[in-house]
Every structure is written in structure tokens, then in C-alpha cells.
UniProtKB/Swiss-Prot annotation:
Pfam families, sorted: Flavin_Reduct
NCBIfam families on file: RutF
Gene: rutF
UniProt keywords, alphabetically: Flavoprotein, FMN, NAD, Oxidoreductase
Source species taxonomy: Bacteria, Pseudomonadati, Pseudomonadota, Gammaproteobacteria, Enterobacterales
Record family assignment: Belongs to the non-flavoprotein flavin reductase family. RutF subfamily.
EC number(s) per entry: 1.5.1.42
Protein name: FMN reductase (NADH) RutF
Organism: Yersinia enterocolitica serotype O:8 / biotype 1B (strain NCTC 13174 / 8081)
Domain of life the protein comes from: Bacteria
Record's catalysed reaction(s): FMNH2 + NAD(+) = FMN + NADH + 2 H(+)
Example GO BP: nitrogen utilization
GO molecular function annotations of the record: FMN binding; FMN reductase (NADH) activity; FMN reductase [NAD(P)H] activity; riboflavin reductase (NADPH) activity
Amino acid sequence: MQTQSLPTDSLPASSALRSVAVDKQDFRDAMARLGSAVNIITTDGPAGRAGFTASAVCSVTDTPPTLLVCLNRSASVYSVFQQNQTLCVNTLCAEHESLSNLFGGKTPMEMRFSAARWSTLVTGCPVLSGAVASFDCHITQVISVGTHDILFCQAAAVIHNDDQHGLAYFDRCYHPLMRQSR
């Protein structure tokens, strides 16, 4: 895994980063209005099995199929993901709200994983049964920004479930996303 910091000295002078006073709480409150899918990110490998809830996940490109996951370097699971170099992004369905809370708290790992059914695909990372979608990935690049690492993850396998409704997080609350009939 290659780690690099965001280069600011290579920006043209006209687009150089300026110091702007943005209140931390105002920023967090505004970001709470940015709705997103709820995901459980899992890993398993030489460093052990771990998982956490994340909404900071998005597509990067489909060639090669790559997405990104943001992970706080102070998170208890950070070193496990860093050492294993593989992960699975499990996008939750509406019925997974309590599972999201388990993986988002201080619950011991064994209790988190015992609350659901899991399988594996290519990397050996836990794949959540009943997830809306699961992306089984290798971590190919890491960029450090502030308190977080941005993990670029290339999908080795993908599955999706057309029978489930999604789960979103908006304004610090869960919201079910209903699939429209086609």
C-alpha cells in the first residue's frame, strides 16, 4: 500500500489553498445535510477480522473498478485495515440499522460479526448476507488528508441484491430508501 500526502506546493498560484476560517462545528453540521448510503466496511487477514460503519464511501472510476473509503487514523480498526490491505464495502439495506449501530460503536468485534450472516468472495473479507451491494476489494493506494486516510480500493468481485431497499444517513438520522418499481 502506497501512502502519500496531498501535494499543495504543486498547485498553480491561482488555485493555491488559502487559509479560510471555517468553524469546525459549522462544517460538521453542513456535512450532516449531505445524505449518503450506509456501509459496513470489513476486513479479514493476517492482522485479524475487523469492521466499522462508514458513510464516506464513493465511486472513483469503473475502469479499473475503483471506489474510495475514508478511515480515521485514530480508529481502533485502523491498523488491522492497514496491515490486511483488503476490504469489503457492504452497502446496507433498510433492515440493517441496528447492525450499523453495532459496527459504529465500541462493541467488541466478535459481537459485531455474530449479529449477522457472512460469507466471502475473492479476498476473504466478510461479505454481509442481504446487503444491497458488496464490493470485495484490494487496497491499491492510500492518501493521508488531515485526520483521515483515503483508501483507494480496486474491486476484485461485486455482488448486488435487487430485492432489498437501501439505507441512507441524513441529518444524523437513518432513512430507508425505497426501490421504485420498474
